[in-house]
Amino acid sequence: MREYDIVVIGSGPGGQKAAIASAKLGKSVAIVERGRMLGGVCVNTGTIPSKTLREAVLYLTGMNQRELYGASYRVKDRITPADLLARTQHVIGKEVDVVRNQLMRNRVDLIVGHGRFIDPHTILVEDQARREKTTVTGDYIIIATGTRPARPSGVEFDEERVLDSDGILDLKSLPSSMVVVGAGVIGIEYASMFAALGTKVTVVEKRDNMLDFCDPEVVEALKFHLRDLAVTFRFGEEVTAVDVGSAGTVTTLASGKQIPAETVMYSAGRQGQTDHLDLHNAGLEVQGRGRIFVDDRFQTKVDHIYAVGDVIGFPALAATSMEQGRLAAYHAFGEPTDGITELQPIGIYSIPEVSYVGATEVELTKSSIPYEVGVARYRELARGQIAGDSYGMLKLLVSTEDLKLLGVHIFGTSATEMVHIGQAVMGCGGSVEYLVDAVFNYPTFSEAYKNAALDVMNKMRALNQFRR
């Protein structure tokens, strides 16, 4: 039996950062991970491969250059899965090496196999490939096992015609048509990628809209752009059956509509990977969809056991998981922290990108907080013309009482990079006046901040003149 100060189950973003943070504090650390999943879902089947796939799609289709060279422009006429996955596998390999090297450098013991609780302090790790069993104990334990795609009962997934977001990375050929069930972040990201590749995509969503946590104006802009790529939306519809035949699939909706397509991809949420952990032996149980409940310090109801990352639910982002892992380790060992910041940017890697930080107009209106809006259009930026992005936009929400920046919403090229400027200003309690006075490199997309800041200040100046 091996004894450690802390044992981390799962090597994704949350688990990795928890392990390294603990090691930096001088603690003995073990991390448990399944055989070929070092780096977790993030590196192997989630964030890294999907975002790399997106980059490959943008490059090979020439999507970003069509504004300049015409709608028919492509870097390669016939794009195959091999073209797309070559880049993906290369990046995954590099990321796995990075994770392994970081663990080795910080003297974190990597124990390969499936871990499950024997008692609240003891984990049995079974490596079925090597037929080995290892028992480890930890004064503290952090669960960071992540999630897997949820699969509705009654739907047969054959990994060829009917698949989920994991299986989509193993397609043998690019489908000419596809039904995407679910208009959440993952569904919309993949819908936009395949639409860019020329696949005829239909998105089916049982709610009346999509991405309802985002700014409505930004969502409408994204929907318009996706429709321009021939994406069809079926909102307020529910799938009742998926029939598979030699020619493809037929998706039947509750309304009676039938949609023929070569492939169906389900993006119906995520399921916590907790069913193999034997949590009852640790005095724990799960909530809906296999999630583990924690407090604001990421402690479970068993004080020495923490949980971080997707397995605890919203926001289920790699970036927030990393911070949760670090903070959980710090709390376990009595290291002072300020807690997790409320300013957490959201990034959606659709084509085009969407990103925001802070409040939305809906939230401010519900809270009766007076604000003004400043907007900058990419088509008015020299960088937008150079890059061929005439559709992008940046929106600032500014308090009319003290000029503080309340929210930043971006749609278009580099949105997920650009959002951090607004995040930094908000985090420092800065006002829109800082952006008015700031000097930005020219030509850049970052200039949009100054343009939007000037726009909102001009609106407020006009209002003040009207009051006189």
Swiss-Prot record:
* Keyword flag NAD: yes
Task: Output one GO BP term.
Answer: NADP metabolic process
* Cofactor descriptive note: Binds 1 FAD per subunit.
Gene3D superfamilies for this protein: 3.30.390.30, FAD/NAD(P)-binding domain
Residues noted as binding FAD in the record, renumbered to the chain? E33, R34, G35, R36, M37, L38, G39, G40, V41, C42
A single cellular component GO annotation: peptidoglycan-based cell wall
Q: Which family does it belong to?
A: Belongs to the class-I pyridine nucleotide-disulfide oxidoreductase family.
State what protein this is by name: Probable soluble pyridine nucleotide transhydrogenase
Q: Which organism is it from?
A: Mycobacterium tuberculosis (strain ATCC 25618 / H37Rv)
- This chain is encoded by the gene named sthA
